[in-house]
Amino acid sequence: MATQAAGIFSPAITTTTSAVKKLHLFSSSHRPKSLSFTKTAIRAEKTESSSAAPAVKEAPVGFTPPQLDPNTPSPIFAGSTGGLLRKAQVEEFYVITWNSPKEQIFEMPTGGAAIMREGPNLLKLARKEQCLALGTRLRSKYKITYQFYRVFPNGEVQYLHPKDGVYPEKANPGREGVGLNMRSIGKNVSPIEVKFTGKQSYDL
């Protein structure tokens, strides 16, 4: 499931619209006062501590995780996402991708509004929660499916969500529930009966 994608750290995205240059979406610099935007690429420093990526769980049988294309264009955004955190250079950052049926405006999870391109879009974010927030908005308002990945400093890519190809709020045959009890909360034993036993009422 983990693949090498060294080009993800410096995707060559050079697109112009209405004679105004786009700001590189992941620039760590502040927004300039003029309309001439600069673009910078974040290159992660390979360290010994980050060379050993955590163990990656295999995908369920019958599901093939989609491959990440680092050349996918980014949404049009004449602002800044605040840059990636320092941990992106020593630990990881996150990439969310989706396909849009048309060019339309959407709200960025970091604040502000951007224009998603018609077709594939790719957005780098510092935190997984930002990907989840944007993905929820894409599905609820725009009816667009999405995927997001974790990218390590050595270029290794780990597919994260949806893990088995089906979003967690939908039923998926064969998916095992975690901590599932087929009873209502009122049928749990009294908490006083399990006090000092090291167990919880939902464990019985």
Curated annotation (Swiss-Prot):
Task: Write out the ranges of the annotated region (Disordered).
Answer: 47-71
| Pfam families, A to Z | PsaD
Region annotation (Ferredoxin and ferredoxin-oxidoreductase binding) ranges? 137-145
Q: Is this entry keyworded Oxidoreductase?
A: no
Keyword tags: Chloroplast, Membrane, Phosphoprotein, Photosynthesis, Photosystem I, Plastid, Thylakoid, Transit peptide
Out of the domains of life, which is the source? Eukaryota
Provide the membrane topology annotation: Peripheral membrane protein
- What would you give as a GO molecular function for this chain, any one? mRNA binding
Q: Which GO terms describe its cellular component?
A: chloroplast envelope; chloroplast thylakoid; chloroplast thylakoid membrane; extracellular region; photosystem I reaction center; thylakoid
Q: Kindly report the protein's main subcellular placement as a broad class.
A: plastid
The entry assigns this protein to a family as follows: Belongs to the PsaD family.
Its quaternary organisation is:
Interacts with CURT1C.
User: What is the protein's given name?
Assistant: Photosystem I reaction center subunit II-2, chloroplastic
Species for this entry: Arabidopsis thaliana
